[in-house]
Amino acid sequence: MDKAAWSGTTYRVREAIEKAGYEVVWIPYKASRMATNAIKAMYYLRYGWGTKFQYAYAYTRVLARSLDKEKIEEVDAVFFCGMGGLAHYCNISKPIFCLGDGTFRLLKDYYWKGVHPQVAKEIDHFDRIGINASTAEIRASRWAADSVVKDYGKASEHTYVLEFGANIDSIDANPIFPYRGGELQVLFSGVDWQRKGARKAIETIEILNRRGVKAHLLLVGLKEIPERYRDHPYITNIGFLNKNDEQQYRKYIETIRRAHVFLMPTTAECAGIVFSEASAFGIPSYTCLTGGTGSYVRNGINGYALPPDADASDFADTIIGSLNVAEQQRLHEGALRLYKERLNWDAWGRGLRKIIEQETK
């Protein structure tokens, strides 16, 4: 399998489906450059630069026409990894399974702010027709699945939750030793400084040190950090690491294994693959209860999800309050258990197989 063609989560999803015992036939869709540029220009002129034209009526119809209908007729079921609305335009007679980590109703004014009303109408429509066309909807969190039912009217018995697994090779998921004292190594992993809460993470580390807990922050994912933090005594900036590059992937694994706890005080999060990765090593996670994080970080089991308005002092209090040996051991074991039961791609594949068998019996 080509990780460049099936990068990140899509690659892991395809791999998990195959491991679950199914043959996967990739049916690509792609608009021509001319059509893409024409529709993009029209939407940018009409609704403003950067408008999300990918869900426009015109564009999604072009994408749907590019699907190989003969290939669709040859398979037993169709699985959409995002863009499920395309199913509506294809008149597919086979069972349709759609995967996503959110809905437009959730993302509007959460991730996507200031969307033009007409564009919002088109995106919402695209979500709705996809959900209506599918045999079953699969979401990466309870938060997202509830919206499919509440906001789009999908029957709850055809709506499922399968958390995303860790995007690491299972052979590398060897548990660390839980914290037993000494300098606390805290991992932060995220590419968006503001949304992922990097500044709050740094402030938490500063408070920990002021309160007598010697702590050091390992920053991963950020290509650059503000100049004021570049020579910070409590920070090591590892930088952005591309997991498709073997050397950088190994660096990522080595960095995770240095950590005792994972801290990401995010302000918006649909799912939480980084929490699955932390749990794979038995590393407790500390985050905010927002979006889909509650499906990945269970209070008192593999970490703590604080209220969305929690500040750095709150995080420092929670970390300090859970640093005793017994609590760290409990969180360590809970993380490993949750990873084994739900937060890995083999478990995801087994869950998908149960869904397919249930929906096609």
Question: What do the predicted segments below correspond to?
Answer:
Residues 267:
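Aromatic "clamp/platform" in nucleotide-sugar-dependent glycosyltransferases that forms part
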Residues 175-196, 202-207, 217-220:
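Conserved donor-binding/catalytic core segment of Leloir-type glycosyltransferases
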Residues 224-255, 261:
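Nucleotide-activated donor-binding/catalytic signature segment of Leloir-type glycosyltransferases, i.e.
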Residues 143, 165:
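Carbohydrate-associated surface elements
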Residues 116-137:
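Membrane-proximal helix-turn-helix segments that form the acceptor-binding/catalytic region
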Residues 327-342:
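A short, well-ordered alpha-helix in the C-terminal region of glycosyltransferases
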Residues 263, 275, 284-287, 297:
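Short hydrophobic beta-strand element within catalytic cores of glycosyltransferases
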